[in-house]
C-alpha cells in the first residue's frame, strides 16, 4: 500500500506592516504616555488632554513596573495596575535619560522587559519606543554621563526593539538639534528640557502614525 501523504503544516503568516498617516488629536484619546520629567511636561503643557499619562520626574526603567504614580482620573497606581484597569490603543514610552549612569545593555534589557509587560497586558496596542532627547552642548561636552554620544548609543539600542509592525521607534531629535547634533540653545533653558512652548504632543501628531483603518 502506498504511504499516506502528510500534509505540510500551514505557516503562520507574518503581520503585514501597515501604512502611516498623520492624524488629529482625537487619535490619542486612547493613548498612554509612559515617561519621566519630559513626559510630565507633555502632560502639563501639551494639548492631548484626553490621553493618559503615567509619568513622574524620576521615573526610570528600573522602577517603572513597581513605582506607584498619580494618574489623572485614575488615582495612584502602579503601571501593571493601570494596564489592567484601562484599555489603550497605543502606548508611548520615553525613558532612559535618568538611567544613563548604568550599563546601556542593562538599560535596554529593562526597557525590553517593560515593553513585554505592556504587550502582555495590552495585546492589541501599538507600542511606540521614543528616542531620548539630546542635551545642550554645554552639558554634553562636560558631563561624562549625560552626553549626546552616550544618548545616541542608547537610542540606537532602543531602536532595535522596534519591529515596524506592532512596535515602532520615533526620534524627534532633528526638530530640536543644532548643526552639531546638540539640543539648540534657543529650545532649552537648562540644556536638558525643551521649553514648554514647544508642544511635544503636537509633534507626536505630526509624526506619521499607523493607520488603524487598514
Residue map of PLM features:
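N-terminal, intrinsically disordered, polar/charged segments of Gram-positive cell-envelope systems
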Residues: 1-29
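Gram-positive cell-envelope targeting signals
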Residues: 1-6, 117-120, 158
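Conserved SGNH/GDSL esterase-like catalytic core that processes O-acyl groups on lipids
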Residues: 21, 25-110
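Loop/turn elements at helix/coil->beta-strand transitions in domains of secreted/extracellular proteins
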Residues: 28-30, 87-90, 122-127, 165-168
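Active-site segments of SGNH/GDSL-like serine hydrolases
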Residues: 94, 119-152
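Generic structural signal for well-ordered alpha-helices
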Residues: 111-115, 155
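Substrate-gating cap/lid alpha-helix
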Residues: 136-172, 192, 197-199
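Single conserved hydrophobic/aromatic residue that forms the stacking wall/gate
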Residues: 203-214
